[in-house]
Structure formats: C-alpha cells, structure tokens
Amino acid sequence: MRLTSLVCFLALLFPGLLNGQEAGLLRMNPDKRNSKTHAGVWGGIEEGRFKPTHAAVFQWSAGAEAQAVRHGQKSSWTGALSFRQTTGNNMLSSMFLEPGYFPVNLLEFTPGVKSRQDVHLEGGFLSDLGYEWAAGIQGAVDGAHSAKKQDLRHSNLGVRLQVEPTLTYVMDDDMGFVTTYGFALRTESLSVENPGAAFLDKGMRYGAFLAGSGPGAFSVREFSHGLTGHFHSEEFSAQLKWIWKRGKAEGAEFGNFTFPGSTVSAFIEQAFLADEADHRYRLSYKRERDQLRETAADGNGFTADSDRVGRELELKYETRFLRGALRSIGLSLDASRWEERSFVSPSVDLTKRNLGMATVFASFSAGGILLDLHAKAGTGLWRDRGRSRDEIEDRPYRQTVDWLRQMEYLMTPRIGLGGSLKVPIPSVGGLFVQLDADWHRALKRTYMGGTNREIATLKVGYDF
C-alpha cells in the first residue's frame, strides 16, 4: 500500500486533526518535505442581542494554536494543541460549559461577567500493516474552566476525553473501507456559592429553585461508545455512525439523575468529476435522542421524566472549479425537526419545532489570496403542547420567559452574511493574515433584547 492511500484515509478519519487540509493531503507523496506544521494566534469579538439566552451581549476572546502532520515511509502522525481565553459581560442563564448538551441544566438570572479558559490537545497516527491493511488511533483531550465572580458566584471545571482506534482496508488509491470504534468521557463539576438562588431545569425550563444557603456541588458525567463504518471511492462515499450514551448527574442539594441516549447519523456523497469542474451532491441524516430520569428521594420511582428527540436532514450541492479565480460555488439546504416531552409532577408538556435553512457559498483564489463568502436565510415553526406560544401558562415552577427567548432565538426568521479573507505575506515565508466576519439579523423579535449579532476574528499564522 502506498503512503498516499494512508494519508487519504487519515484525512477521512481525522479531519479535525488535519485542519481541513484533506484535498492537499490527497496529493502528497511519501516525502518528508511534504510534512506540514502550522502555528497561529488570533483574537475576536462578538456583540449583539440576537443570541442564545446563555451568551454574552459582548465578549472578546483570544487564543493560540499549533498543528503538525508528519509522514514517514509506512506511517503518518498528526497532532494539535490550542488555548483559548474568553470573557463576556451580561451573562446569565445556564452555568454549564456547553448549555443544552445535557438534558438537565442549572440556571441563574443575575447578569454578570464570566470568564472561561479552554485547552485542547489531540494526536493520532496511521500505520501500514501490509496486504492493503492499515491501523491507527486518534486521541483528544479537552479541558475547560469557567467562573463568575459576582452575584451568584459559581465555577465549573470540565474535561472531555476521546479515543478512536481504527482499521482500514484499501483496495487501491481511490477505494477502501474504514471501521472505527470510539469511546468518550465527558464530565463537568459545578461549584455554586448559594444553591438557593439557582434554578434546576429538568427539561423545557420546568423545575424548581433549590433549597439551602451554603455552598453546593453538582457533578455531571457521561460515557459514550460508538461505531463507524465508512466506504470511499473516487466519486462516491458513504458513512453510517451509531453512538450509545449514558450519563449521571448528582449533588446533595440538586438530586440524582440518569440520562441514557443515542445518536444515529449517516451520509452519502456522489461526485461527478470533469476536466474543468467537479459537481458534488451530499445527503446527510442525523437522529438524536436523550432521556432524563430523576430518582425519587426514597429511591423508588421517578419524580421527573423528559425525552428529547431530534432529526436533521441536509442536502448540499457544490461545484469546484479547477480554473479561474472562482474556485467553487454551492448551495446547502437544511431541515430539522425536534420534539421535547417533559413530565415534572403535576405537569406534562410537549414542544415540537421545525427549522429550515438555505445557504449559498462561493470560494475565490487569486495570487495566493483566498476569499470565502456565504449568505444564508431560514425560518422555523414551533408549538408548545399543540398550542401557540401566547397560550402558554406562566406557572411558578417554569422559567417561561427564558424558555420563550430561547425558542425565539432558534426559530425566528433570520438572514446572515459572512466571509473569510486569507492573505499571504510572501516576503516572510509562510506568514499569513486571515480575517473572518459574520453578521446575523433576526427579522422578527418579541422576547429577545435585539435583532443583530456581529462576529469578527483576526488571525496571524505561519505555515512551515
């Protein structure tokens, strides 16, 4: 098996590690001079009130990253390291590091300044075993810490560990099979100064304010196992992935919860290759389900029960040009449907929401300068218990306003524009400057504080 085949499947398996350089890696030869190293620093700002309920009205962030890919005669290695510092003001709602990921949530409603630090480390290798077989492994560790030092003071420490061994069979340079097993562990440990001022969300913002006046701790952990099967040829590829999850959350002041879940995703992609342009069609499907069970104080039965089921369907078309400044142009159509059911005695509720999004994008290249542009528009519809949102009853055990703001952010009609400009500095070797910018606008607002959101990031990097 030639190393180009190994690199091909390294790009397929570890796209995050390779930083999106799959197309370039496919053309590499087994030559040490083709090894890649990248380093960069960046800073950015986000501002605007068209945002999730947990996000800052204004935030700044800065970070540094380094990535490398090395090729030997029979093996390839890759690795990356990054750090990010973020500070935002007027932050409230979820105390978790990734709000909405877990089916249980802890909320607070006093705006304040929150800071966060993220560290990411990953690495992997792929080795030729002979007789058209190759094996490899990918590993990644993420650590994050956030803290709020005023009003309801709290801090959160999170760790995510992921390991994915893989086995590859390559029939030739353009066709092969990949099988991957994945294991992941995700934990978050919350420390809250006064739990009595926090609201425990047991699903759809139903729950209760907590009792107690002393410090409290709330820990959440989740294990997941997954299997992936991937087939790839020159013009066709397909993938099926299944993930099984089981999590637990507990704390003396917060109660005990279990939350099993599963995810099934698949895609097929067909390419039509020509001398001057390639045409690619991609159809993706994803189904997620999370359940939440709260154990009663006596250990018998449940006092809360919620269920989230989501389905996403995406159709994407892209044309890649081999000549001229316009290198690619494409259209992406996305449709998703979510259902959430919550039982918090004595209430049973059901929410259904549907969202559609259309995105057009184009890529230009001239004199080493790269320009990517995109525009999008979308809208959604949702109903709570089959009623319109104006008919929702405001009950003491539900944070209705926070729920309505979050639903409006997800479902309101919107438009957006964005782009990325990368300019090389030839006089300093591989030095480059990159500017990314996005603008989002809500076309209808009732509960959110504003209709605009602007994001800008400036990066200075060096490709060795």
Over which residues does each language-model region extend?
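Membrane-proximal, glycine/serine-rich, low-complexity loop/turn segments characteristic
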Residues: 21-122, 127-133, 168-175, 180
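Outer-envelope beta-barrel architecture signal
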Residues: 33-39, 73-79, 131-137, 173-179, ...
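Long, internal scaffold/assembly segments composed of regular secondary structure
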Residues: 211-331
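Transmembrane beta-barrel strands of outer-membrane/channel proteins
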Residues: 39-45, 79-85, 137-143, 179-185, ...
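Short, flexible helix-coil linker/hinge segments at the edges of structured domains or between repeats
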Residues: 93-105, 182-223, 246-256
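Outer-membrane beta-barrel "beta-signal"
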Residues: 169, 452-464
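Outer-membrane beta-barrel translocator domains and adjoining extracellular loop/strand segments
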Residues: 49-56, 90-96, 146-154, 190-196, ...
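Residues that define the transmembrane beta-barrel architecture of outer-membrane proteins
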Residues: 58-64, 115-121, 155-163, 221-227, ...
